[in-house]
Amino acid sequence: MKQVRLLPSATVRAACAVAVAAFAAGCAQIPRDPIIQQPMTAQPPTPMSMQAPGSIYNPGYAGRPLFEDQRPRNVGDILTIMIAENINATKSSGANTNRQGNTDFNVPTAGFLGGLFAKANLSATGNNKFAATGGASAANTFNGTITVTVTNVLPNGNLVVSGEKQMLINQGNEFVRFSGVVNPNTISGANSVYSTQVADAKIEYSAKGYINEAETMGWLQRFFLNIAPW
């Protein structure tokens, strides 16, 4: 049996190659930053303890007046968002240009060249034509419900809401995140509002799992894809 002994330099090169391969494999999945950066929930401030008045009704315990509806208006209140997004977009463009040119002139000859090039002339013709068309269309539909929490109350009374829903299905973890600004006047009696009535709405649907990792190209692969000439 023939034995092969690696020189120190060859050993170092082999170790570097293994390290680069492991680094490239580890970079196959690049985490994506969520579009919603604000907190997903909020808790109301702890109310100050009040001395019991001795009656049946305790305003400090109830948290809201007796004859007030249950619509959210304070930090920590919850609200149901009815997601009903349907967006269609179509775009088309075209361009057409045509340019032609023709040049014809005689070349004067003198002396002994007259016999050879007596009828010599030059002509040039050019034609440039360009035609292009393009089109794109997109259709997105997103329906569902998510319950969010009031994280802030603006000075004008509008509510800043955000929330997250996580679902573990088989071996994949799916996320639904929502944030926006809600006008309390648009909230129905069922304590819900449509997403189309929410200002600055940010809706995110993503997943984590082996299927999502298989569909994501690593940054090192994207680098070689951009510089490859084929």
From Swiss-Prot:
Please give one Pfam family short name.
Answer: FlgH
Which UniProt keywords are present, listed alphabetically?
A: Bacterial flagellum, Cell outer membrane, Lipoprotein, Membrane, Palmitate, Signal
Quote the cellular component terms of the Gene Ontology held in the record.
bacterial-type flagellum basal body, distal rod, L ring; cell outer membrane
Note the lipidated residues of kind N-palmitoyl cysteine. C27
Return one GO MF term. Answer: cytoskeletal motor activity
Function description? Assembles around the rod to form the L-ring and probably protects the motor/basal body from shearing forces during rotation.
Describe the protein's quaternary organization and the partners it interacts with.
The basal body constitutes a major portion of the flagellar organelle and consists of four rings (L,P,S, and M) mounted on a central rod.
What's the name of the protein? Flagellar L-ring protein
**Source species:** Burkholderia lata (strain ATCC 17760 / DSM 23089 / LMG 22485 / NCIMB 9086 / R18194 / 383)
Question: What is the phylogenetic placement of the source species in the record?
Answer: Bacteria, Pseudomonadati, Pseudomonadota, Betaproteobacteria, Burkholderiales
